[in-house]
Structures are given as C-alpha cells and as structure tokens.
Amino acid sequence: MLFTIQLIIILICLFYGARKGGIALGLLGGIGLVILVFVFHLQPGKPPVDVMLVIIAVVAASATLQASGGLDVMLQIAEKLLRRNPKYVSIVAPFVTCTLTILCGTGHVVYTILPIIYDVAIKNNIRPERPMAASSIGAQMGIIASPVSVAVVSLVAMLGNVTFDGRHLEFLDLLAITIPSTLIGILAIGIFSWFRGKDLDKDEEFQKFISVPENREYVYGDTATLLDKKLPKSNWLAMWIFLGAIAVVALLGADSDLRPSFGGKPLSMVLVIQMFMLLTGALIIILTKTNPASISKNEVFRSGMIAIVAVYGIAWMAETMFGAHMSEIQGVLGEMVKEYPWAYAIVLLLVSKFVNSQAAALAAIVPVALAIGVDPAYIVASAPACYGYYILPTYPSDLAAIQFDRSGTTHIGRFVINHSFILPGLIGVSVSCVFGWIFAAMYGFL
C-alpha cells in the first residue's frame, strides 16, 4: 500500500513537472524527495553525480561551438546538401537533422534547418509534412547515436561497472550498436514519409487554402538562407576543433591502451569525455576569440542546464523511492522482464514521454533495471527506446515543425494523438530497437 502511494506521488511530480515544462521537471523532483524522506522516512538515494558532471562538460563544449559560429558552418553545409537534392528531401532531410544531432549532441540544432526544409519541399510541390515531421523525429533519434550527447555519455557512465560475460562495455561498443541501428531507423522513416499523405495537387483542403491570393503568397513566400553568407575562418576553425575532439574521444574509447592507467585500470571514458569536452571549449575560446559571455546565453546551454536539473531531481527521486522497495520490485518485475525482455523497452519509452528527456529517462530507469536483474545486454540493445516523447506533440522541436510549415500539412489532429509525428516516431524507434538487438547479438552482447 505504501509503495502504491509513493508511486502515485512520483507520477504526480512527473506529470505536473512535464506539464509546466522546462526546469520545473527537475525541481518537482525536490517535492517528491522531501515527501519521501521526511514523511515516509525513506533513506535518500544517491544523486547521479557522474552523469551530471558529464552533462556539464558536454553542454559547455557544445554551447561554445554555437557561440563561436561553428554550428553555422554545419548548418550551411546541410542547406547545400538539401537544395542540391530537392526531389529526395523526404529521405535526405531526416538524415541531415540526425547527422547534425550526432555531431553536436543535441537535437535543438533542428530549429534553424526546419525553415530551409520547408522551403525546399514547398518550392518543389512536395507535401511539407513528409520531410518536416521526419526531420523533427530524426533530430531526436540522433541523440542516442551521438558520442557527445547527454543520453549516450549517461548510459556509458551507468554501465561503466557492468560486465558482459567478463567484458566491459566500451564507449565505441555502444556507438557501434546505436549508430547503425539509428540510421536504419531513419531510412525507414524516410521511405515511409516518401509515400505519406496526399500530394499537394490532390489535397482539396490545401488547394482551397491557397486559392486565396494572400494565403498563396504566405505559403510560397521566401525563407531566410545561409547560402549567401560568407562565414569567417574562425567559424570553420571552431567546427574543426569540435569535430577533432570527437574523433580523439572516439579513438581513446576504441583503444584503452592509449589512455593512462591507474592501479592497473585504464582511465575511465567518463572522465576522458569530461576532460576533452572542457579542453574543446577552452581551445575554441582561445583560438577563435569567442566571447565567453555569449556562451551562457544560447539555446544549447539553456537546454543543457535544464537537462542537468531534470536528471538531478528525477533520478534522485526515483533512486530514493525504488531503492527503498527494491526487494518487492525484484519479486514483481524481475521474472516478468526476464521472460519478456522487450517489456524493459516499453517501460523506458513511456517514462521518456513522461519526462520529455532521453537522458532523464535513462537515469531513472537503467539503475532500477540493473538492480532487478535485467540483462545489461537488453539495456544496450533497447537504447533507442529512450526516445518516446513523440507520442504526444508537446516537444519543442515538434511544435516548431508545425509552426514553420506554413502550408498547414504538419499538424495536430482532432484527437491530439493523431498528429504528424506519431507514425514516423513509432516506425523509427521500433526499427532502431529491432536492429539494436540484431547488432548487439552480432557483437556478442546477446
């Protein structure tokens, strides 16, 4: 009975925090914590300090990249690619947004490219919903495939002491599973999007809308472009510093002999990532003369700090509650998950929707899953399931896609659940999880 009451308290905090949005999600964890500790006298769990430190380092480097103009270079290259292949925008666009996320570690880079995707689609009489919805989904799917994303480094940190038949999960082991499985999922989204919805010339509602001259001008109006901008060399230098750091981190992750050893053990990749991300930010500031004051004012830094508070409050609250009832949870869920391993992926997917964060969902669920005996291989194979907040169209990138689509084809349906993102999201995540299991088996984890 007490467990049920405490679980309801946690769910109320999650629902209300998600509804308020932003930093409120993590702060609401504080309410749950105080009630659990001072009212129910549960011993406080341990906050995920390692995960939070990694997030701080990665966000600092990514925000510095944006402040330096290095991100503009990536976006300019992406726009050139899209405008050279307009007929294939429904397939190319989600790959572009996913790649940007993989390189930058955050899906928030999609906001700048969405108007360009719309312009390419509408000027070629392609239903904008096709590439717009796919691109928003693709940007978020890329998070679990990025070597510098909060979700990936968090998962590596949480699985750092876990062995798979005597073998530790290395940084590149995880990426070797998540990158190809994610890209195959993106391909599935692109193929689906190619055929979805009515062509614009057969869409009676759209044709009626543009029959009004003002509406037609609004729908087919010009969009801002990066192609006519000559970016300074410092922007290019910042981009190469950032990409070079990612390459070095990947190399150190691939070969533990390249890392210094202490007590017979190579330096943890969790610490390596922190060190090199801080180094990256410092080099960009020094070599490109980026104004440090501008770093804390951009979208990447803001969203990253919100992620830290979310992981802090939610994961600490969940650890406190589930840690106190671990024996009961093991008894109820342990056998079920062993018999139906896919149940873990469904739980992770739903929690992700509640918290609107892949990193926060992993931080809340992975420690519990390990404690009740879920095979770590299942956790790795099902990693793409940490993206579930496409289920309802409340995430900022989805809302942005709707706003940037002036044709109105990217939309939220009458029943809310029948929106433009639900099918691409289900297809992409499901296909990625299936291939995640296949690649995990190929590499000997399953």
From Swiss-Prot:
Residues 88-105, 106-114, 115-128, 129-133, 134-159 dip into the membrane without crossing it. GO terms for cellular component: plasma membrane. Changing residue 127 to A: Is able to catalyze uptake, but has lost the capacity for antiport activity. Its main location: membrane. GO terms for molecular function: C4-dicarboxylate transmembrane transporter activity; succinate:fumarate antiporter activity; symporter activity. InterPro entries: Anaer_Dcu_memb_transpt. It comes from the Bacteria. It catalyses: fumarate(in) + succinate(out) = fumarate(out) + succinate(in); (S)-malate(in) + succinate(out) = (S)-malate(out) + succinate(in); L-aspartate(in) + succinate(out) = L-aspartate(out) + succinate(in); (S,S)-tartrate(out) + succinate(in) = (S,S)-tartrate(in) + succinate(out). Disruption phenotype: The growth the dcuA-dcuB double mutant is severely impaired during anaerobic growth with glycerol plus either fumarate, malate or aspartate, whereas single mutants are either unaffected or less affected, depending on the C4-dicarboxylate. The triple mutant dcuA-dcuB-dcuC is completely devoid of C4-dicarboxylate transport (exchange and uptake) during anaerobic growth, and the bacteria are no longer capable of growth by fumarate respiration. Deletion or inactivation of the gene causes constitutive expression of DcuS/DcuR-regulated genes in the absence of C4-dicarboxylates. Keywords: Antiport, Cell inner membrane, Cell membrane, Membrane, Symport, Transmembrane, Transmembrane helix, Transport. Changing residue 398 to N: Constitutively expressed. Affects regulation of the DcuS-DcuR activity, but not the transport activity. Interacts with DcuS. DcuB/DcuS complexes are present both in the absence or presence of fumarate. This is Anaerobic C4-dicarboxylate transporter DcuB. The gene is dcuB.
